[in-house]
């Protein structure tokens, strides 16, 4: 089994300050090492935070990202820092969700990617945002994202 080349990574294994914005955040990638094999990678961020662009109040979401690599994997520490960079970023739920997905697609050029963002209610209305690049490759196992529909107290 070949060892993954991590020589080009700038954040893994070092102390890194949190980026102040998504634009400042550096996403990094590593070779998958499994060319020709379709598999699904899932990242779950159950405590994602951003700010409402109108009120500055915090917004919270449970985000699930699934993708089928085509040669590249996102380096998980850089993804964590990228997602954390939204903490002080003002944007609507839809913008945060789609921007995250498009940034990953730009970095990785995956065979397929989907994101589900399950935003916690503000003003009594939950907003769920879903985006994907197209149909997944045939034959890959795609488990349910596992986030229950918001039911309130009823």
From Swiss-Prot:
The keyword GTP-binding does not apply. It holds the Pfam family QueF. GO terms for biological process: queuosine biosynthetic process; tRNA modification. One of its GO terms (cellular component) is cytoplasm. The active site is at 52 (thioimide intermediate), 59 (proton donor). The keyword NADP applies. Keywords: Cytoplasm, NADP, Oxidoreductase, Queuosine biosynthesis. Its EC number is 1.7.1.13. Residues 1-24 are annotated as: Disordered. It is an enzyme of class 1 (oxidoreductase). GO terms for molecular function: preQ1 synthase activity. Transmembrane segments: none annotated. This is NADPH-dependent 7-cyano-7-deazaguanine reductase. It comes from the Bacteria. Belongs to the GTP cyclohydrolase I family. QueF type 1 subfamily. Substrate binds at residues 74-76, 93-94. It is found in: Cytoplasm. Pathway: tRNA modification; tRNA-queuosine biosynthesis. It catalyses: 7-aminomethyl-7-carbaguanine + 2 NADP(+) = 7-cyano-7-deazaguanine + 2 NADPH + 3 H(+). Catalyzes the NADPH-dependent reduction of 7-cyano-7-deazaguanine (preQ0) to 7-aminomethyl-7-deazaguanine (preQ1).
């Amino acid at each position: 089994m070949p060892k993954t080349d991590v020589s080009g990574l700038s954040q893994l294994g070092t102390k890194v300050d949190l980026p102040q914005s998504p634009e400042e955040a550096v996403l990094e990638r590593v070779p998958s090492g499994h060319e020709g094999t379709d598999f699904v990678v899932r990242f779950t961020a159950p405590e994602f935070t951003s700010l409402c662009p109108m009120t500055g109040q915090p917004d919270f979401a449970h985000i699930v990202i699934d993708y089928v690599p085509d040669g590249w994997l996102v380096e998980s520490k850089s993804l964590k820092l990228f997602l954390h960079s939204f903490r002080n970023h003002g944007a609507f739920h839809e913008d945060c969700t789609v921007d995250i997905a498009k940034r990953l697609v730009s970095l990785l050029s995956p065979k397929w990617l989907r994101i589900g963002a399950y935003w916690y209610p503000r003003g009594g209305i939950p907003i769920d945002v879903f985006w994907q690049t197209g149909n997944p490759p045939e034959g890959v196992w795609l488990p349910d994202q596992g986030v229950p529909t918001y039911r309130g107290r009823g």
